[in-house]
């Protein structure tokens, strides 16, 4: 575990306009490194936001907002639970590294946390993309005092791309001889294997609202009537290959045709 890990955050924003038109633009980036030494963990995020407000007339105003964000997560192929479990149960008589530099033996199941926390075992990379848009219109009805109509539409798009590449790795054990020779042992999977997943999600939200507020002498009348419609759908596609001849080519078409799997699903809901 590292004593500290760097983090960064930066953003730039611009706003301005006039009485009838206002705008706000923002670009941002932030991220942090993992807590393991030579860590395969990392998180980066990049985003863009824009808000526009316009007063079209004395009775109509329009606002539009959009947000685009990408989240990039990088993980080792072993889970944090597995890594910390091995770290907690490590034996003081088993070295993390031999004096000659080779990685020490595992506790069991190939778990040597100084190796499984790095990209020596492969990687698990996940990218999430968000696009969120909202358009809103307010209309004050001039011939009906106190009546305002509001309509809004939201369109959201989400993509997720995951690529997980597991590859064999070597740990070294003492052969028990007086010459203190360490011998390699293959751990992990016998051959590299690749999992890829793609998720595509779309969401619509439409709403209409009529709001009436008016004071008559000592009495105030307020009535609100609205309706809303929503639709969501998602498509998922996944594929798996193994028996790669080399761990240098992490592409699906380089995997073997034996024991391959493909899968997919979709769903839709509305209200």
What positions do the PLM features span?
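Flexible loop and strand-edge segments within Gram-negative outer membrane beta-barrel domains
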Residues: 3-28, 32-39, 47-113, 122-130, ...
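Long hydrophobic segments that form regular secondary structure
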Residues: 14-15, 137-145
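Extracellular loop and loop/strand-boundary signature of outer-membrane beta-barrel proteins
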Residues: 33-38, 51, 118-124, 136-138, ...
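Extended, hydrophobic alpha-helical segments in both membrane/secreted and soluble proteins
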Residues: 48-50, 151, 206, 271
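Surface-exposed loop/turn segments flanking beta-strands in extracellular/periplasmic regions
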Residues: 82-113, 167-190, 233-264
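Alpha-helical support elements that line or immediately flank enzyme active sites
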Residues: 134, 138-139, 155
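Extended hydrophobic secondary-structure segments that form protein cores and membrane-embedded regions
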Residues: 149-157, 222-229
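N-terminal start-of-domain structural block
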Residues: 154-217
